[in-house]
A protein has these predicted regions:
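Negatively charged, low-complexity tracts enriched in Asp/Glu with abundant Ser/Thr
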Residues: 2-55
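Amphipathic protein-protein interaction modules
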Residues: 52-110
Length: 110
């Protein structure tokens, strides 16, 4: 990784974080690098992320991979007994099926 992104929470392992939500601090985060994304898509990303953490718990992030593809990353604190890994997996699949248009638009944007 280049030193340019060494202490940058939005860039890690060649990935660029677009947005995410954290059930522990009940916050939504959006990478300001993508402020040019239309507001309607920003709202959809907010809804997707927050609803995910309300349903499954933990931390949910949407990231751009090196190849421009989009990945969903889910994580939970080690001692979190409320995080539902099965629900998280099902929700990721549901998002991929129902939000195809937005995901494709974001990949083109990136």
């Amino acid at each position: 990784m280049s030193d340019e992104y060494k202490d940058d929470p939005w860039h890690a392992n060649g990935r660029v974080v677009l947005c995410g939500a954290n059930a522990y601090d009940r916050k939504y985060y959006f990478n300001p690098e993508f402020n040019a994304v239309p507001d309607s898509i920003k709202r959809e990303l907010n809804i997707i992320s927050v609803l995910f953490t309300q349903e499954a718990g933990g931390i949910f992030t949407i990231v751009f991979e090196n190849d421009g593809g989009i990945s969903f990353v889910t994580d939970a604190e080690e001692d979190d007994i409320t995080y539902d890994e099965v629900s998280a997996g099902l929700l990721v699949g549901q998002i991929r099926r129902t939000r195809t248009e937005i995901l494709e638009s974001l990949e083109l944007f990136y």
